[in-house]
């Protein structure tokens, strides 16, 4: 991929900029701008896929949760990506070359001073939501999540490492 064009989403995107740079660094590419011929921000996850499909970029970073849950899958399902002849592109027209570890979502939290029965009721409401009203839960989660689970601070270790990396990048740019 050296000297090829890289499409990123937005400077403030976690899945479309910060995580890809973090992953590239782990692969021995600490400076994307020096390694790739050109690095462009496409403005959105969808635009990154369009740029890749149209050949504007050779590689693009994007959101990917699973084979069926990604910007690429959503756009292919809606026939938004086209071949030059106008026919819809297929999954086989693309190649996933790297996947990062999952990006953890922000937590739902409650005040630790709440009474224990209130804490238990809140947790139960979240954990029971997918079974109690699946249609409402699917709408709330865009059909992308299976449910909630308790988390610990250890679950955010990767995110903390990412934040430190991004902070170091910003400091390097500023100097």
Stretch-by-stretch model annotation:
Residues 2-3, 124:
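Alpha-helical secondary-structure segments
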Residues 5-115:
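Pocket-lining segment of extracytoplasmic ligand-binding domains
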Residues 110-175:
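An extracytoplasmic/periplasmic, membrane-proximal ligand-sensing/linker region
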């Amino acid at each position: 991929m050296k000297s090829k064009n890289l499409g990123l989403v937005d400077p403030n995107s976690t899945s479309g900029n910060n995580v890809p740079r973090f992953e590239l660094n782990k692969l021995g590419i600490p400076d994307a701008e020096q390694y790739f011929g050109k690095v462009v921000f496409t403005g959105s996850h969808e635009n990154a896929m369009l740029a890749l499909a149209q050949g504007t970029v050779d590689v693009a970073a994007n959101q990917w949760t699973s084979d069926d849950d990604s910007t690429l899958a959503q756009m292919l399902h809606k026939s938004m990506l086209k071949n030059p002849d106008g026919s819809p592109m297929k999954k086989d027209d693309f190649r996933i070359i790297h996947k990062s570890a999952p990006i953890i979502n922000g937590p739902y939290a409650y005040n630790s001073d709440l009474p224990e029965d209130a804490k238990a009721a809140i947790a139960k409401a979240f954990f029971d939501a997918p079974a109690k009203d699946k249609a409402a839960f699917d709408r709330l989660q865009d059909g992308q999540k299976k449910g909630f689970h308790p988390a610990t601070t250890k679950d955010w270790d990767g995110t903390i490492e990412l934040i430190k990396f991004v902070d170091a990048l910003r400091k390097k740019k500023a100097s």
